[in-house]
Regions:
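Peripheral, non-cofactor segments flanking catalytic/redox cores
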Residues: 1-99
Length: 99
């Protein structure tokens, strides 16, 4: 039986492979309605990915100490690890806490 870590990595690998396949397609060949439908599906997927991101951030900030990751605050850790601004990191943490 695979561990949850292995299953998570396999699922993420599959998602990345699917993205590469989609990105390689000649999207300019789609009709306008097809492009609109694709945009709708991508928006839905983006919302799901954002929700998962906030869930993980919420778990990190409630379960751990940012000092263990080399930061005085979680915003410092996330901004460094994710290469985002400290303000963006604070916004994501606030969203995670309110979810």
């Amino acid at each position: 039986m695979s561990s949850i870590r292995e299953k998570t990595i396999a699922a993420l690998d599959a998602a990345e492979a699917s993205y590469r396949k989609l990105a390689a397609l000649p999207l300019e060949a789609l009709t306008r309605p097809d492009k609109q439908a694709l945009l709708n599906r991508l928006e839905e997927l983006d919302k799901k990915m954002t929700a998962l991101d906030r869930r993980l951030i919420g778990q990190l900030v409630t379960e751990g100490d940012p000092a263990l990751f080399g930061g005085a605050a979680w915003a410092d850790v996330l901004s460094r690890r994710l290469r985002i601004s400290r303000g963006e990191a604070q916004r994501r943490i606030a969203e995670a806490r309110s979810a």
